[in-house]
Amino acid sequence: MNRCRDEGGRWATPDEQAVLARWSGWGAIPQVFDPTDDRYLDERAELRQLLRSEAGWSQARRTTLNAHYTSAPVVQAMWHAAQQLGVDGDGVRVLEPGCGSGNFIGFAPAGTVLTGVELDETTAEIAQHLYGARATIEATAFEELRVEDGAFDVVIGNVPFAKVTPHDPRHNRGRHALHNYFLIKSLHLTRPGGLVVALTSRYTLDARNPAARREMASMADLVGAIRLPERAFARSSGTDVVVDMVILRRRPPGAEPSGPAWQQVGAAPIDAADDAAPLEVNEYYLAHPEHVLGDLAATRGMYRDHELTVTPTGDLDQQ
């Protein structure tokens, strides 16, 4: 990209685009940004030089917490689900918040009107080089995106996860965590009858506190959810977390809530140590265990010793 800038701001060539398309985000290499990790001194120095500014370096370092992008089979499955629910592509207004390099934009049906939002300027520039001919890429924080509520027919993507509370007086009055905020704002930006199709941390559905789910349920019905196994994103983004694909449909004004129950949690049907606290899972999965792509189990997780996971039982691409 530096070469493109230095040569008059030209677009990337097809060969350069092929290289850029392999980008999986800063989240896959957090150790390069860790000044205490001496194994990557050379790589750290080279990357600082390539980013060309302290601001660019700081911005990239901040996104290592949540810049995890999505493999092609999962993206294609999500678009397939949207199309099965009536998204035909012709003039459909689509938003991808936290778009990264544009994985979902790249697989969008022909004829869709696409907008991507990406905080990291380097990654947004990659998306622009890859998909600028067919999409509008906004290099800004999702909190700063100013569009009318109901502006989109479909919001699709992989929402970021981090223990931060975005400041947005309009769309985060409940002071929800980042992943839930993305979903709540996405629902606001979706027209009545439109869809939000998103990958999110399992904590959206499994958190004991139902406040975020209640706020979502005040606007939308759950169409369905699929829980992916651990390591579903290890190959493409370097992260090893359990995530859900959730599909929400924005209710028209005055419509009664419908669809499956999903606001409460219950005891997960797994064996645990006698002294361990019970692990909880969303009531949707207790009623629909076939929507868990693997076996529920207890493991040592990213944030605690005793955490719910899903061990794979087959080839995710085939499931």
Residue ranges and their predicted role:
Residues 115, 136-138, 226:
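General small-molecule cofactor/ligand-binding pocket signal
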Residues 125-146:
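S-adenosyl-L-methionine
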Residues 119-121, 174-234, 241, 245-247:
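Conserved Class I SAM-dependent methyltransferase catalytic core
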Residues 65, 169-173:
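Surface-exposed cleft-lining segments at the edges of enzyme active sites
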Residues 1-130:
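Class I S-adenosyl-L-methionine
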Residues 108-111, 128-132, 155, 188, ...:
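Short, surface-exposed basic-aromatic patches at helix termini and helix-loop junctions that form
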Residues 235-319:
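Flexible, glycine-/basic-rich loop-and-beta segments that form/coincide
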Residues 9, 75-85, 89-110, 116, ...:
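Conserved proline-anchored active-site loop of SAM-dependent methyltransferases
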